[in-house]
Curated annotation (Swiss-Prot):
Keywords: Cytoplasm, Ribosome biogenesis. This is Ribosome-binding factor A. The lineage of its organism: Bacteria, Bacillati, Actinomycetota, Actinomycetes, Mycobacteriales. The gene is rbfA. Belongs to the RbfA family. InterPro entries: KH_dom-like_a/b (IPR015946), RbfA (IPR000238), RbfA_dom_sf (IPR023799), Ribosome-bd_factorA_CS (IPR020053). Pfam families: RBFA (PF02033). Disulfide bonds: none annotated. It is found in: Cytoplasm.
């Protein structure tokens, strides 16, 4: 079992090797727009999980996930041999490719936040147009005794019975 620091160093090295091989050495059109995001290595250094994301050719184009997955699976052996040559470890880890869905989660959160901001703006508009119900001052002024016939002035602010 390797220590965690060694596993992290190996993962970083694998990430660099795979990313540069995809960008410069492997000439598969399905790998256009593939970006290596992260690599996780098991504690025994025998398996490496490579997380990738795919971008479209332009900002308006949708990414082609199926072509990228197929191209990565076709290049898996070549990439593993390049990792073995570049790392110098006794056992070259097997590579597993998993699409990173963080960008999808971020886009979904941005959409939810935009909807919440729009709802807040609607509530603010309703609040600006709202008027209080009833009269302008529905509460009685404590100094006013108008309309109180037969009530002793000393009993107006008392909380106990009117017959003191």
């Amino acid at each position: 079992m390797a220590d965690q620091a060694r596993a992290r160093r190996l993962a970083k090295r694998i990430c660099t090797i795979v990313a540069s091989a995809i960008e410069f050495e492997i000439k598969d059109p399905g790998l256009d727009g593939v970006t290596i995001v992260d690599v996780k290595v098991t504690a025994d250094l025998h398996d490496a999980t490579v997380f990738y994301t795919v971008m479209g050719r332009t900002l308006e184009d949708a990414p082609d996930y199926t072509a990228a997955t197929a191209a990565l699976n076709r290049a898996k052996g070549t990439l593993r041999s390049k990792v073995g040559a570049g790392t110098g470890v006794r056992f070259t880890p097997t590579l597993t490719f998993i699409r990173d869905t963080t960008s999808d989660s971020v886009a979904r959160m941005e959409e939810l936040l935009a909807r919440a901001r729009a709802a807040d703006a609607d509530v603010a508009q309703v609040r600006l147009r709202a008027k209080p119900a009833g009269e302008a001052d529905p509460y009685r002024d404590k100094g006013s005794v108008a309309g109180l016939v037969g009530v002793d002035i000393a009993d107006i602010d008392d909380d106990d019975l009117t017959d003191d």
